[in-house]
Structure formats: C-alpha cells, structure tokens
Amino acid sequence: MSPNQEPGTTARVFGHEFLWTAQHPRLQDIRKMLHTYDELASDALDRLDVLSPPSDKSPGGCPMQKRDLYALLERYSSSDQAIGRLWNQVTDIPDWVDWDQIRRGQKFVYQYYGQVQLCLLFTSLLGGMGAWRIVETLSRTGGFGVNVCRRRLLETLLHFVQVVESLDSIKPHGRGFASSVRVRLLHANVRRRIMRLEKQRPGYYDTEQWGVPINDLHQVGTVVAYSVSLVFLSLPRMGVFCTEQQIADYLALWRWVGYVMGTPVDWMSTPATAKAMMEAVLVSEIKPSSNSQIIANNILAAQTNSPPLYASRQFLAALAYRLNGEELATALNIARPNIWYRSLAGLQGAMLNLSSSNYALLPQAWQARRDKKLIQYSHNMVTNRKIGGLEGTTIFELQYMPEIGRMTEMGRVNISFWQRVTNYIVGLFMFFSGMIFLHT
C-alpha cells in the first residue's frame, strides 16, 4: 500500500522527516522505472559482441572478460548504427552542462574530501544496501562476498577519484568519462546475464517484484546515494552544512556523470527537485532485507583492520551509525557500538572539519597544490598494492559472474588481538601522516 502523498502530509523514513509537496514524484510513477532500462547500452553491447567477439567466452555466455569495451565502442562508433547511437549520446553535450559549475563541484569534493569519502563508503554503499530490490541483483553477482568485497569497493573508489580528479578527466575522452562509460556497459552485461539465467531457470530472478536488473529507478537511486543524500543527509550528520551554491555545484557534477552512465537525470535540474526525488526513492526502496544485512555486514568485515586506516570493526560500526542514523543501521543488523567508539567517530569528524575549515581561505596557488597532492594520494591509495590497493588501474570488466545457485553469504575475517593492536597503531600513523602530507 502506497503512503498518502497529499501535499502537506508528514512522512518519515529511517529518521528523515519531511512534508510531501507537489514537487515530489508520485511513487506509482517512479516505480514504473523498475521495468525500464538503458536500452542504448544493451543494444551497443550486443553489437560489440558481434563485431569483436571475446576470445575467452565462457560456457555461460558472459562475453566481457579481457576486453576494453570503451575502446571498442569508440573504434566502431562510426561504422555501426547501434554503437554510434550510444557514442553520440555520451559525446553530444546537453545544453544544461556548465563546465565551470562542474569544476566547482569537483573543488567542493577537494575541500571536504575526507568527509565525502566516509559518506560514500558508509552511506552511499553500506547504507545503500537498505534498498531491498537492488541487493537482489548484487547478491547474485558474488562481488560482495567478504573475500572479494574490498576489491569491489576499491574499484568504486577509483571511479570516483577519476570523476573528480580534473575537468578534462570527466569531459568526453577523459579518464573519468571513459570509466563512467565502462561502468555503464558493465551494468548492461550484468543485466543481460541475469535475464538469460532467469530465462534458463524461471524463478531465478523475480522481475515482477524486483524489476529489470539494474533498471532506471535503481540507476536513479545510485546517483541519489552518491550526490543528493550526501549533501542533504550524510554531510550534515558529520557537521558539514553545505551552502546552496555548493549543493547546486556538486549536483551538477553528478547530473553529468549520471547522464554519461545512462541514468535519467531530468529530476536533477534543481536542488529542490533532486531532494524531492531522493525522498520519494527513500520511501519507495529503502526496506532492508536479510540480503541487505548480509552485504552491509560484509562491507564492514572487508574494511575491518584494512588499509589505509586499519580501523576496528567497532569503530567502523560507530561510523555506520553516525552517518546512517540509528534506525537504518539497526535495520541493517550492524552491531551497536559503545560510547567509546561513538566518541572516536565524533572526534574523527571534528578533526576532518577542522582540516577543511581553512580551505576557502587559502590562496588559489596553495589550493591547487593541496588539490594535486590529494589526487596523487588517492590514486596511490587505490592502485598501490603495497598499501592495500588494486595493483594498477581497472577497465571495469565483469569479474563476478552471476550463476544459478550463487548468492552472497555472510562472511567474517579472523584476526588476533595483537594484530588488532598493531593495526590500530598503524592506522593512527597513516591518518596523521596523510593529514601532514596534505598540509605541507
């Protein structure tokens, strides 16, 4: 049963209270997007398989391994109609794109980089697992098992770093742009794979209840998690209250990224309509299931005592409660942290806010130097295997293949007391050395 959306009616969802207005989309309307999807990418992917068949095609028909689909897309864009349609869509710049505003959105990230990264991990990713329909797709890929989850998180972080590293990176042919297109084609491949398995064994994936895998609504929800919920929910919980200009600039960045990734983005034309969509999506989609709990806890387990901060499970849980609120964190079955770890989480937020407070006062040359160091540090953290990175970059190929009978299970990481103590000391060293690096 849908809630009463009469304008002026109060709604409350996991600690967030708001009034329904005429700007809010009707739930029955946004739920129609459960059954629509990015057909441009699907059609282009089918043609790429014909023009450049994979050399190592699996028996299950999952043809994406060892191919850079972005390079192939560009190569065949002028000679194939379906591929050309997708290429033209991502390279023809819409009238609403303002590169100066997008650059300001990137610089907003630089100012609050530590806070934004924590919000992305604990709200966009971990908290986003409360979306009960989305996790049905994620559970079937196996990419959020505890032993492989960290790589999945690093790939997501790499994409984000490439998106914000420079304006040229997010423009057509740039590194962040290319990664966004690769992720779009990855989504098309996962969707196709799951639908083939459903056809092979009816009941494997319930499209009536969950919608098409990686549908338009869930694409919207993903962009909401990375942008709107971050500025309206997550950052304020860390004590960062964005100005109207900062909000508009950051949303402009993600409107463009979402567009490149094949997401409907008209609802992002103003911060007010974006906030209204966020609230409607929260009411419609955030209902944590048992699979939500499994994946959320696997994310925590994968990050426990891992570089760069080597944080304990209790400290990570405290961050999860701080950034998602008591209700959602409890619904995700995250163990409740004690007052000590909650205090540490609050102290970390205060230190990050103190570090960010002087950014706007710095001369532009100093800001540019700090920004450059920040991007270098981030790339090193993600790609340097010696400190827990990926050992290089990635082309976002399909590594976690949906299979009949494969579902993500709850995992755990065992670590001794002395390892925890050592990791705690190393984590403190990494945190403070990183702060010193950025400010010298």
Give the predicted meaning of each segment.
Residues 1-224, 229-440:
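Mature, function-bearing regions of proteins
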